[in-house]
Amino acid sequence: MFGAEIILTPGGEGSNGAVKRAEALAKEHPEWCFMHQYQNDANPMAHYNTTGPEIWRDVPEITHFVAGLGTSGTLMGVGRYLREQNAAVKLIAVEPPLGERVEGLRNLDEGYIPPIFGNWDGAKLLDRKRVVRPRESIEMTRRLVQECGIFAGISSGASLAGAIKVASEIEEGTIVFIVCDGGWKYLSTGAYTDDLDAAEAAAEKIIYF
């Protein structure tokens, strides 16, 4: 549409391969602009300046904040803001098990740690991580549609699953989780229509990272 050249990278490398290729191109062509959402400080700052204050304004009684671990921008930006308002707020990251795939999320033990996570002292900021499997993510994605009328994506279902796990572990509290993507991106995956076994198998074949 805009005359841009599309540069493909090996599918087996997932988005990590695309990021590495983009980094190499940025070095080769310093006059080009590489936004780099995994490293660009504007990512967490957007959440520090907007999402965090909105949550605090609407839910000042928040005790736990749950979000998926992708670029880590949401967790770092919102998390830092909430901690500055109330140091007792617990910050929980949601990630898939090592070797399993949930779209939009990553397990830090798989070798790629987003620069934002390191630059914003993510290891110190987070209280804990909750592991959510692909099947749980799809189940919760369907619940969001069927029970709440929210057409969200699979990583949003994972965040809901993580929030429910947190809720099962505490006696009382106020948990906020982030619906971070839209369902329109997953219409071809069968996540909303296939039986769960088929939907899970399809999700496992898609390489995101």
Where do the PLM segments sit?
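Short glycine/serine/threonine-rich phosphate/pyrophosphate-binding segments
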Residues: 68-79, 155-163, 186
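Active-site/ligand-binding loops adjacent to catalytic centers
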Residues: 3, 19, 31, 83-154, ...
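Hydrophobic/aromatic beta-strand patches that form the interior of the parallel beta-sheet core
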Residues: 7, 33-35, 66, 92, ...
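Gly/Ser-rich phosphate-binding catalytic loop and adjacent alpha/beta segment
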Residues: 1-26
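Active-site/ligand-binding-proximal alpha/beta "capping" segment
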Residues: 29-69, 78-81, 123, 135-150
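Glycine-rich beta-alpha junction loops
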Residues: 39-42, 70-73, 95-100, 109, ...
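Short, well-ordered alpha-helices that flank and scaffold nucleotide-derived cofactor binding pockets
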Residues: 57, 80, 84, 164-168
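Conserved active-site loop/cleft motifs that coordinate metal ions or position small ligands
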Residues: 151-154, 174-180
